[in-house]
């Protein structure tokens, strides 16, 4: 049992080094797109990716703990809570991703990703920004929260 596990670990190490040539790759993940939806101070991050076909069976057999770490690293949200994870997509919730400036105004600061993201979408209640082939969201974005609905009379 130790020999196959050792072979799998060594294979993962070699794949990580070979993957460095592709800018949207990190180890055995190739990122296709990232969508960030901002609401209040919370961000919901959806990342679509591909797992190398040779590694996919190993991830399925040995568990997805390493995949969790890699998804957090490529998104740059190491403290994000993964709420859904598959071999093609992950959804993270990041608490306190934006700063609350009071009176319903928020600021999502500049952010750096662990890879070059081919397609990045950042949505607020007021607007959507789309960027292509970037590893940073360099300017940040200000927005207003959705006003609470008044109670029915």
Regions found by a protein language model. Give the residues of each.
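Secretory targeting signatures
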Residues: 1-22, 47
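Lumenal/extracellular ectodomains and adaptor appendage modules
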Residues: 18-153
